[in-house]
Amino acid sequence: MDKGIIFLAAGGTGGHLFPAEALAHELKASGYAVHLVTDSRAERYAGKFPAEEVHVVPSATIGSKNPIKLAQSVWKLWTGLRAARRLIARYKPRAVVGFGGYPTVPPLLAATGMGVPSLIHEQNAVMGRANKMLASRVQAIAGGFLPEGTGAFAAKTVTTGNPVRPAVSEAARVPYAAPHGGPFHLVVFGGSQGAQFFSKAVPQAICRLDDAQRQRLKVTQQARPEDREGVTAAYDKLGIPAEVSPFFTDMAARIASAHLVICRSGASTVSEVSVIGRPAILVPYPYALDHDQAANAAALAAKGGARVIAQAELNAERLAGILSDAMNTPDALAQMAANARETGKPDAARLLASLVEAIASGSTVAKFKEARS
């Protein structure tokens, strides 16, 4: 059954594309054709994204105070807006859904200007800059961590949770096995683009563990390309079996195999760790403009599903102590895993797809909320 085309617009990083991918699978299963509107960075993820077509639209970040760079950004956004208008005129999508990042601005501005039903999904507990620009123009705002009852846009906000990909749903079927004295699998990653801080801190911390604990360890670590060789050499020197790579296509399965996860706290990361149900040490990215990662981490920690430590407070000695305690208290890890799973929203993609269908058919958020209650 062909219900028409839905445009999904997302910035080209995993944090934006992963929830868009999850929604795409749900919409396709419901009979919609999905087109992805994004930037050139999305190429590494395109293989698993179930889009009929992928459209790369020019866009730019507006943040520079340099007048020349500012003019270049404005021109690029204007070029992207014209391109997005042509796409909408050609394909006539039933709705346009934005997932954040500046590449969503041209297609969402085009949609709202041309009368196409539109909504945005905000993954974080704090709304990002691109979504803030669009919030007043769209018909609905779906939130991963945004509360429904507060803020200027409360009337059109629906807390759906963050959609997780089918691979995450599959990984969530694997029960957590508390490591009672046996091998201990540590999984370390920093979001889709890696984290340089972990490349130094984690090997240095493991170096400080006693021999018996190091002999139990197996490490899977995401590292940036420029750090990969150094991280691999550090683990080789310690005799730690380690798999180090800039990108893992099967990250969900690797999280499921972990006894403990150390990671950043982007919205998709927190949502996936929660749905899979694994204990985590969350280290929020300290340079985020809106401190959104700290807010995301706090939401999971409040339920006992993670421990949050600021990067400025985490040195090798402290991390070694945390790892040692974790390896010696498997029952506490199991409880943390159970708490994380309880906070997860495995049906977020289905709920978001229902909201998209409602908006595409001309309904309102008020009617959607009434039907849910």
Curated annotation (Swiss-Prot):
One Pfam short name: Glyco_transf_28
Lineage: Bacteria, Pseudomonadati, Pseudomonadota, Alphaproteobacteria, Hyphomicrobiales
Name of the encoding gene: murG
Enzyme class: transferase
Protein name: UDP-N-acetylglucosamine--N-acetylmuramyl-(pentapeptide) pyrophosphoryl-undecaprenol N-acetylglucosamine transferase
Organism, scientific name: Sinorhizobium fredii (strain NBRC 101917 / NGR234)
SUPFAM superfamilies per UniProt: UDP-Glycosyltransferase/glycogen phosphorylase (SSF53756)
Keywords: Cell cycle, Cell division, Cell inner membrane, Cell membrane, Cell shape, Cell wall biogenesis/degradation, Glycosyltransferase, Membrane, Peptidoglycan synthesis, Transferase
NCBIfam families: murG (TIGR01133)
Biological function: Cell wall formation. Catalyzes the transfer of a GlcNAc subunit on undecaprenyl-pyrophosphoryl-MurNAc-pentapeptide (lipid intermediate I) to form undecaprenyl-pyrophosphoryl-MurNAc-(pentapeptide)GlcNAc (lipid intermediate II).
